[in-house]
Amino acid sequence: MVRLNSAAGSRWWAPAMAILAVALSVEAAEVARYDNYRLYRVTPHSEAQLRSVAAMEQASDSLIFLETARKLGDRFDIVVAPHKLADFTETLESDYIPHELIEQNVQRAFDEERVRLTNKRAKGPFDWNDYHTLEEIHAWLDQLASEHPKEVELLDAGRSHQNRTMKGVKLSYGPGRPGVFLEGGIHAREWISPATVTYILNQLLTSEDAKVRALAEKFDWYVFPNANPDGYAYTFQVNRLWRKTRKAYGPFCYGADPNRNWDFHWAEQGTSNNACSDTYHGSEAFSEVETRSLAAFVEKLRGKLGAYIAFHSYSQLLLFPYGHTGEHSPNHQDLNEIAEATVKSLAKRYGTQYKYGNVYDAIYPASGSSVDWSYGAQDVKIAYTYELRPDGDAWNGFVLPPNEIVPTGEETLDSLITLLEESSARGYYDEKH
């Protein structure tokens, strides 16, 4: 676990408060812009360097970490506000931390995306040629239930902090089937996640491919494309890089990380107690109504769910429990072997290479996640997290071009078939119904 250097943290705290005050105007629906924000790739090579960078992450809202500080030798990308550039580079240079300027104006990518989406609004039906708003996704789910009343049932897991519906669907071809839960969009800025989940759902419902049909009809599917509806809407309306929920924590800070808020080894590893941090774990386990509501829904399925699959981006990883400890789970060998077969299957169509492993060792310590909770608290022994395209070398991973939505969906569905076939062959769904 990274421990913060208090001296380094204090260097960043006062300036952070200044920029947070400016953020109050953003809450009034003024679109957040990142003009002349720069993107740096930083690679700590010593424990002292890692502590220094971690202190910046915890203390300053002037910096946006696109990935959480991890292990020595890992690269991670940091968006730097113009007024903070001198302090940021001075810290890196004084601590001899290797760094590289990747992009001089982050806003450029967001402007291109916004123009494209604005043009799309005047066009045709729901498809996977571009990304969709929360309202469009919810309307499409309503349409599925209307057009396929025998197979598709609308689900309502509750209301978000801002009173949006936690909407999902159940896809079923008959009683007595084991359940598979698909969770999308728990991190707001990861747009490829809901896009992939809706693509998979559509294929399960409409594909004539024999393997897809067999998969669709073997399980009951509980599908929630947007587990963080407030945050997702906020990325379209105000701040494209928003990650958390939208609950207010004091006058300056909003939201908790909904994938650090679940009641399984909550707040132990890889989280922050700073409410302004992107990895803030919340005031208590299930402090966020979104995680609390989704957990209550899943608890009602206890004994029926055979698998819980969460979709995130980015880095091209397939991960499984645990995140709070390096100790292996009881069925670690099975999970590892299934993951190995799954990533091989994923690579066949487009050559996309994934890595795999337990969360703690493969990427970084992270406690309080939905997948760890489903595994550890709900006894769902097939529990995986996909970190979708692109790989970790891409700085603009949250702005994945729309022409990669369908390929991402195709290869992910290929791999999901293998994942569920491999786990089924090991008997994991024999008593789930």
Curated annotation (Swiss-Prot):
It comes from Anopheles gambiae (African malaria mosquito). The lineage of its organism: Eukaryota, Metazoa, Ecdysozoa, Arthropoda, Hexapoda. Its cofactor is Zn(2+). This is Zinc carboxypeptidase A 1. Its EC number is 3.4.17.-. Residues 130-423 form the Peptidase M14 domain. Pfam families: Peptidase_M14, Propep_M14. Keywords: Carboxypeptidase, Disulfide bond, Hydrolase, Metal-binding, Metalloprotease, Protease, Secreted, Signal, Zinc. Involved in the digestion of the blood meal. Belongs to the peptidase M14 family. Expressed in the posterior midgut in pupae and female adults.
